[in-house]
Amino acid sequence: MKQPITADDISRDLIHFIAKSPSTFHAVRGIKAALLYAGFTEIREEDTWQIEKGGKYVVTRNGSALMAFTVPQEGAEAFHITASHCDSPTFKIKENPEIADGPYVKLNVEGYGGMIMSTWLDRPLSVAGRLLVTENGHLAEKLVAIDGTMLVIPSVAIHMDRSVNQHKEWKVQKDMLPLYGMTGAKTPFMDVIAAAAKVKAEDILAHDLILYSRVPGTIWGEEREFISSPKLDDLQCAFACFRGFTQGQKEKYISVYALFDNEEVGSATSQGAGSTFLANTLERLARSLGYSYDETMAMIARSFMISADNAHSVHPNHPEYADPVNRPVINGGIVIKYSAAQKYATNAFSAAYFKKLCKDHDIPTQTFTNHSDNPGGSTLGNISNTVIAMPTVDIGLPQLAMHSSYETAGVKDTAYLVDAVTKFYE
């Protein structure tokens, strides 16, 4: 007899997914491969679409954002959408990356997103991303991930800097350049990258390469209630929404799984939530099915989107940073996020819709608002709604140390979101 899938099982699968997703390009490639294995058909934005009833499709943009959708056999009335993002704060490797400085060779990097910089010090790091190369006279894309510790960003010993444990302003160009090797004793960095990608260094025309932490994810705690890992924001939600999307029985609605890039730097890119990617996808698939423009706009107005991006749990050592009343806790359930400043898309209707969905299936929810003297951040829902408006709830899973290189969340919460998304698509 087949054993039921437990929250622990789901978290182990999440850790595996994160380990296989060192860059946004790898995350999208992995999800696309899983969808193709499940019978989805890949379509391209540059081609004319021929969407069929009963079909399952996946399309990518820039190799770092993805839309997947399923079409019912009859009577699609609206779209049911989940949106999450696959990027996380990190360091991007600049062009001409090597800096020889005395006896050492460092890599020239710049910050991507609002990270807790000190958490990147003294960690085993490596490099992942994509290369654009010439291959048989044409441009070709190659993904690369160095499977081994390649770099460390060393901290300064306390004997040399007595202020190291005081609040400190970290400068990327001075403090955060990763150590690559000793002058004259290392293979050039781009030669190592080329060898890993099985191309010649002289054939590399451009690259999108980032650093990633090689510290593995783990499940821990007296009752194995915690999960700690790099990139929980937002691969935890991306994974849970994907699993719910593939599990839910899809009838009546066109079900859409949206995975965006560049949320951590504002989403205002061609592959971000502020782009036309979602709007173009919905309109093109509806028009291909024979819906008029007016019918398509009516479908969108009847639709609903769950924007899933992780939320802040109340901190065990610093509860004063949380709202006095709305204080999510790890393993307390899915967090519904509110903002009077409209940093989140949640309103009374969308909150009630999502609460009822969860209540009907015994899935716990919590509420989050920022401390009134702390403006907080924004996320996908309100940004996407400026391009394609529909009722949207901004939700997330409670976590600690958001934007650290190693974050902590709850084992039960991932399972709660899988369950909620599955029921949403049903």
PLM ranges: what are they?
Residues 1-426:
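N-terminal hydrophobic/helix-forming segments and targeting peptides
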